[in-house]
């Protein structure tokens, strides 16, 4: 049993003992009173001369009958009582009121409720603050990592070799500082791990704890600030005091943006609780008092909101980017996680890594776990490649919703919609390859076409972005061609949103609009209130941007319409196949449209000799520029 359990049992036993003690002292036996009678009954017994003696204390009368039994009663203001007792030969003993009960016992009984409340309050205060002092609000919540249990080391971290190298140097410094001090080097005071969610920042911190033979404290950024003023600053001071007592040591602060946001005019004024906490942290990290041997490692996925004073050298000397892994990194991560499950020889980490571009380490771990769950659900003894593919589809496209009963009309419309996406994607060489097309409802969609790039992409050119817009618009175009303009549904709303986002990014951020030019009109980083702020642009420029976005989307729409109109027979073939099979892989779609067997594994490159390329209508563009100039003079010089 842990210390907290023993403490609760001890307090419970003490509470029960005091209650029992109180009841015993209140019981009749301890006070010599066994039978309460009415005053009228008492007078009757006196007159019948059945009472031997009485003891009077104030208005309380306790007596003994001739047969040895005891009794008690309460006397009203009755002046003739003594005369009546003496006339009936009753022995009378008068006891002073203040000596009836032991002084300490009386004090205990009278103050028992108050003492009980104080005891309960002290108990809960100790439990809330880890068994420390009753007023332990300002105590740090940093937890010292226990040596018990399995350790995570750098061998368990894969796919982020650069970050591991930077942090390995810090671990080596803590193990053998003289190696670096010989050359005059100083240990870094802090390292900030920056990266999107799921890339392994916290896992790296756990690996450092497993590698470094020094005390390792961990705390969350949200653990500092509470409702009481001054608590956060006090906890920061106490945390660094803990670090000094255990130096050399490492303190890991997860999600530091919860306390390290840049200072400004907040809701509580410029001196609010969070800012006091941040100010104290700045002083402790690099103030007048040195904290030699205390290394701060923090993690965040929002470096843009952190205060600049926190990021300067001397506080966080190193900022280590932890990005999503490339194909080699994904393969290494998959191998680490595959060690934890049973799988057969069909599972190839390289193939899975190639089909999961953009996946973070956490997503890859989830994919492997989902595959194991799928295999267990099917009663298999080992995970095979089919389970991995099914898990990938579940992660990418969502859970299959077989409970939705689609009518034949809806199924046919969905088949043409998804067939339009797939067909235009095949005829756009710059578009990402088709991974799978399905009309089985998954997630929030009735059907979808999943595209995956063959390699990791870190940027996109104009042709790729315009091809993506055309693929987005192809579903709506297919509905319009097959069912007519009045039968177009709202199912393309998410496609329109995706196309609009790409087109607006081309115009406002990437400088890919000939009309607007290479000028940035996107949003800046968050302001002091945490809101997105944007550059100051005129109303006329905003209209130009909207016109360019519309032109790019319309261009993609017309391009998709041209492809689908020209290859209408293939659209019918693909839609009918989707209605029959419900799900087709990218290779099956190519086989289908090339006249091969659907499940042929023969290498089959779809004939791109008839592929289309988006061409900008220069004449139309110049006409738009001219008309805009006529409408808004002096906008573009």
From Swiss-Prot:
Tell me the name of the encoding gene. Answer: ftsH
Q: What is its main location?
A: membrane
User: Transferase as a keyword?
Assistant: no
Q: Which GO terms describe its biological process?
A: protein catabolic process; proteolysis
Localisation: Cell inner membrane
Membrane-spanning residues: 7-27, 104-124
Q: Tell me where on the tree of life, at the top rank, the source sits.
A: Bacteria
Native species of this protein?
Rickettsia prowazekii (strain Madrid E)
Note the Pfam families from the entry: AAA (PF00004), AAA_lid_3 (PF17862), FtsH_ext (PF06480), Peptidase_M41 (PF01434)
Q: Which free-text remark accompanies the cofactor?
A: Binds 1 zinc ion per subunit.
> Self-association or partners: how does it assemble?
Homohexamer.
Where are the active-site residues found?
A: 418
Family that this chain belongs to: In the central section; belongs to the AAA ATPase family. In the C-terminal section; belongs to the peptidase M41 family.
* GO MF annotation, one: metalloendopeptidase activity
Q: GO terms for CC?
A: plasma membrane
What is the name listed in the Swiss-Prot or TrEMBL entry for this protein? ATP-dependent zinc metalloprotease FtsH
Enzyme kind, highest EC tier: hydrolase
What does this gene product do?
A: Acts as a processive, ATP-dependent zinc metallopeptidase for both cytoplasmic and membrane proteins. Plays a role in the quality control of integral membrane proteins.
- Tell me if Nucleotide-binding is a UniProt keyword of this record: yes
Q: Which residues lie on this side of the membrane: Periplasmic?
A: 28-103
The cofactor named in the record is: Zn(2+)
